[in-house]
């Protein structure tokens, strides 16, 4: 019909003083015939903006139309969420509705953008999700929130709170800014350490700023881990997997991290303790990003040294942890012997060192 008809409907409601009126009267107001206006009425009815009863010839304007107008004008908040179902060949349906709880099980939903402004989207595993009341849903798969990626077996999205609940995660990893210039122009790279077993939630944006138009909300998305998480160093590339995750791991305390889309690498700090398979006593430390893009730390042993291998030796000097392993350099006193080395590798059942002559 050329111009947007919604403002005209709003004006007509104001004129007649009611959201309920005859379709033929509205057609006359628009200077149209019923034949002209029927396709529009059916379309608006399908969108849920009005309820058009063709048998009775009546129109009822729904509240959704006013929310739609408010969102388009910028006066009201809105979201960008769309559920696009494109099932693989052989799948007979896009969705099935449970008559017990009205959950809608959807197929072929490969991705859902939750916030363009905050760079947050989800990728349901095998394109499957369960849509619940008021656009909330559950799924398994991958969450991408800014420069944070999470894979898990159970997530839920709470529309009212605009929050992703991390119920059962497998791993969480970050993409950090490169320290060096890169020829392909890639400004970020994947952190080489993962946080395992994260439980908590991600607040995508302020619940009243689902559109992301209020750009003053710089702190979002916000990740809050409410349980302890773990960093392991048992990759086969690290001394042939010598650091068994059952005995050697870093236990990260619950933490909160904001600005997941634009955080600084220097701000990534995870307090906790290293359990080192009895190489050292438990070490309270803070994980930060190391030069090899893994999470680790560098610390100085106390002046009197630190017990090594359950008191069999004493170590003095630097201790470092990264994907290079648990390393050191300095003095080692073992029984009645003394040695100095600038390259020590501490392993659960042994150490290797290049002695300084």
Model-derived regions, located:
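Structural signature for solvent-exposed beta-strand/loop edge elements and short helix-capping sites
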Residues: 1-357
């Amino acid at each position: 019909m050329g111009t947007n008809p919604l403002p005209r409907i709003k004006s007509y409601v104001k004129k007649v003083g009611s959201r309920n009126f005859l379709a033929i009267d509205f057609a006359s107001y628009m200077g149209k015939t019923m034949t002209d206006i029927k396709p529009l009425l059916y379309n608006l009815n399908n969108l849920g903006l009005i309820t058009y009863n063709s048998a009775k010839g009546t129109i009822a304007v729904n509240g959704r139309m006013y929310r739609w107008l408010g969102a388009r004008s910028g006066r009201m908040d809105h979201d960008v969420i769309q559920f696009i179902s494109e099932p693989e060949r052989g799948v007979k349906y896009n969705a099935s509705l449970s008559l017990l709880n009205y959950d809608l099980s959807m197929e072929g939903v490969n991705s859902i953008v939750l916030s363009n402004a905050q760079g947050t989207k989800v990728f349901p595993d095998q394109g499957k999700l369960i849509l619940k009341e008021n656009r909330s849903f559950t799924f398994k798969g991958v969450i991408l929130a800014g420069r944070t990626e999470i894979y898990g077996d159970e997530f839920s999205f709470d529309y009212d709170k605009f929050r992703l609940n991390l119920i059962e995660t497998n791993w969480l990893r970050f993409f950090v800014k490169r320290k060096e210039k890169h020829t392909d122009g890639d400004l970020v790279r994947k952190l080489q350490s993962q946080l395992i077993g994260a439980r908590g939630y991600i607040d995508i944006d302020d619940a009243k700023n689902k559109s992301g138009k209020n750009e003053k909300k710089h702190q979002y998305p916000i990740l809050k881990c409410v349980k302890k998480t773990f960093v392991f160093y048992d990759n086969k590339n690290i001394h042939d997997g010598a650091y068994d995750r059952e005995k050697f791991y870093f236990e990260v305390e619950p933490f909160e991290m904001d600005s997941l889309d634009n955080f600084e690498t220097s701000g990534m700090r995870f307090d906790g303790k290293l359990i080192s398979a009895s190489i050292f006593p438990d070490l309270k430390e803070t994980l930060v990003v190391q030069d090899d893009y893994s999470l680790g730390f560098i610390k100085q042993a106390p002046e009197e040294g630190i017990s090594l291998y359950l008191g069999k030796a004493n170590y003095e000097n630097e201790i470092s942890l990264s994907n290079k392993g648990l390393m050191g350099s300095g003095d080692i006193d073992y029984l009645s012997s003394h040695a100095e080395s600038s390259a020590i590798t501490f392993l659960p059942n042994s150490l290797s060192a290049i002695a300084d002559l």
